[in-house]
Amino acid sequence: VSKVTWKSEPDPHDYPAAASYLSLIATTDQINDLIEQLKAAPLSHYKAKDMLRASGLRLLPQDNPHVAADVTKVKNNKALSPVLLIRGDLAHGITLQIADGYHRVCASYHLDENTDIPCRITNHPHNAAR
C-alpha cells in the first residue's frame, strides 16, 4: 500500500474551489467569512473514514477519474493538498462539509481508511455566534 504524503499548506486554488462549492449552500457574506477563517485555521488531522462518516457522503469508487488521478499521484510520490472542511452541528443535523478535497479524501480512504488527512477546519456559520 502506498503511503499518502501531504503538502504543508492547501494549494492556492483550493480556496476558490471551496468558495464555488459553498456558493450552493451559503450566502456570499458567509462564504467570504468561511474562506478567511479557513485561511487562518491551523492544520488539524482527521481520519479519512471519519470525514466520510461525518459528511454523510458516499465513498466514490477507485475508478472515478478524479479519485484515480489522486491515487496515481500518491503512487508517484506526489504530495496531496490538505482538505478544507466546515464543521457540522450534530444538535441541528448539519453534516460536515468537505468544501474542497472530496476526491482526495476518497483516494486516501482507498489506500488506507485510517489515513490521517491534514485539513483546515472552521465552524459552520450556524455555530459561529456561540
Per-range role (PLM):
Residues 1-64:
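An acidic, glycine-rich, mixed-charge low-complexity segment common to nucleic-acid enzymes
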Residues 2-7, 11, 80-130:
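A short, basic-hydrophobic beta/loop patch
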Residues 38-97, 109-110:
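Short alpha-helix boundary/capping and kink motifs at helix termini
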